[in-house]
A protein has these predicted regions:
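Active-site-adjacent substrate-binding region
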Residues: 310-337
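Alpha-helical scaffolding within the catalytic cores
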Residues: 252, 277-284, 336-342
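Active-site-adjacent mobile loop/cap segments within catalytic or ligand-binding domains
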Residues: 332-385
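N-terminal catalytic or cofactor-binding beta/alpha core of small enzyme domains
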Residues: 26-261, 272-275, 371, 382-385
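Loop/turn elements at helix/coil->beta-strand transitions in domains of secreted/extracellular proteins
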Residues: 225-229, 260-264, 292-293, 331, ...
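N-terminal Lys/Arg-rich, disordered targeting/topogenic segments
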Residues: 1-19
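Solvent-exposed loop/turn segments at secondary-structure junctions
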Residues: 185-188, 236-241, 270-275, 301-304, ...
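Active-site microenvironments of hydrolase-like enzyme catalytic domains
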Residues: 183, 192, 258-301
Length: 385
């Protein structure tokens, strides 16, 4: 959805029934963080009038059955998880000469004279929402440098899963091994830093220099530099929003049929966090440069109702990728979101979804995160050759 401030959202299925979404309340603080959104709690209700806050980019896949299979666009946080994240969230370090590494490091060389773009202090039309920049805390199940937010009833043993190899075999033989695509192709970012976000500004764009396609381009470059075959499919799937996951599924299947060597599919998204009074910008500093925090999502199908029987194989890849991202910088990656949903991750045993920043991160920050993620992905895949 384009705006956060709607109290009630009406969603129509093919049968025309109107359903309400119930979500959690917004936690308000009076200190560094004005508020942190409680993410969307996916519940289909009838005859109830619960206050609803929606996340930008929400999409209902076509039909109620698909809703149960794919879930909603954004996963949710429980009240206790939000409270803990807010209590442990930290401010983003200032960028100074001392924060810039003196050695060539992952994603950026010190020889690069990085200069961030000038901030935009323009006062736009509409309601102004202060942008709260923070590092989202690693809250959840922990093992070494891996943190998982487990929203399922599965008793996850991270160490045990790491002991099993993913069902992915990578070859550097010139054939496509990875497919990068975007279910919500229009999810976009800010051109430059802003103190406030305005209700008149768009959170979606067809400009490939400002939306998630730009992030996919950075990941693609890293894979190509490493000699790993990759296809970056930029098909628009979210116009209209309804049925986007159905259309991206068709794109995946077309690419798999044309290129059966593909082992891994990555659905690159942009997240959205905030409430009635603020927008959250998850950011960290790596090698003296701001990067948007990212989040990997891996699905679960405990009762077999989602048609995702091999979810554990996908999780094993996700955990290794999470670990390699954390090896770059612990604050680079938010907790892995292990959730009761499918999101087209049943396409292959190496299918995952990754969220880059939010709508108030800059395109510069998320492109840098795409480079860093690309490095972690290369390292993960090269270990599976």
């Amino acid at each position: 959805m384009k705006h956060f401030g709607r109290l009630f959202m009406v969603i129509e299925t093919k049968r025309g029934r109107k359903l309400l979404l119930r979500v959690g309340a917004v936690l308000v603080t009076t200190v560094a963080v004005a508020c942190f959104s409680i993410r969307l709690v996916p519940a289909l209700l009838s005859n109830q009038n619960n206050t609803a806050l929606t996340a930008a980019g929400f999409i209902m896949p076509d039909g109620a059955v698909e809703v149960m299979k794919n879930g909603y666009d954004d996963a949710y946080f429980s009240v206790s998880e939000v409270e803990e994240m807010v209590s442990q969230a930290s401010s983003v370090p200032e960028i100074t000469e001392s924060t810039v590494t003196s050695e060539e490091t992952v994603g950026q060389s010190s020889s690069e004279a990085y200069v961030p773009p000038e901030p935009d202090y323009t006062v736009y039309e509409g309601t102004a929402y202060p942008i709260n920049e923070m590092q989202i805390a690693n809250v959840g199940l922990k093992y070494e440098n891996i943190t998982v937010r487990n929203d399922t009833d599965y008793e996850l043993d991270i160490a045990q899963e790491l002991g099993f190899s993913p069902d992915v075999k990578i070859k550097k033989d010139g054939t496509p091994q990875v497919l990068i695509y975007h279910t919500h192709t229009g999810e976009s970012f800010l051109k430059t830093e802003m103190p406030n976000f305005y209700s008149s500004l768009d959170t979606r764009s067809r400009d490939e220099n400002l939306n998630v396609i730009a992030v996919g381009n950075e990941i693609t470059k890293k894979l190509e530099e490493a000699g790993i075959g990759v296809i970056h499919d930029t098909t628009i799937h979210d116009d209209p929003y309804t049925g986007a996951y159905n259309r991206s599924w068709e794109t995946i299947q077309r690419n798999l049929n044309e290129n059966p060597t593909i082992q891994v599919t990555i659905d690159v998204h942009r997240d959205a966090l905030g409430g009635e009074s603020t927008r959250i910008k998850p950011t960290t500093v790596i090698n003296g440069r701001k990067a948007a925090q990212i989040m990997i999502l891996s699905g679960y199908d405990g009762d077999g109702s989602l048609g995702f029987p091999d979810w554990e194989l996908n999780l094993r890849l996700a955990l290794r990728l999470q670990q390699n991202c954390a090896n770059i910088e612990q604050s680079f990656i938010r907790p892995l979101n292990f959730t009761n949903s499918r999101y087209n991750m049943n396409a292959t045993h190496g299918s995952l979804l990754v969220e880059f920043g939010t709508e108030v991160n800059t395109i510069d920050e998320v492109k840098y995160s795409g480079q860093l993620f690309g490095d972690a992905l290369v390292k993960t895949l090269e270990s599976l050759m």
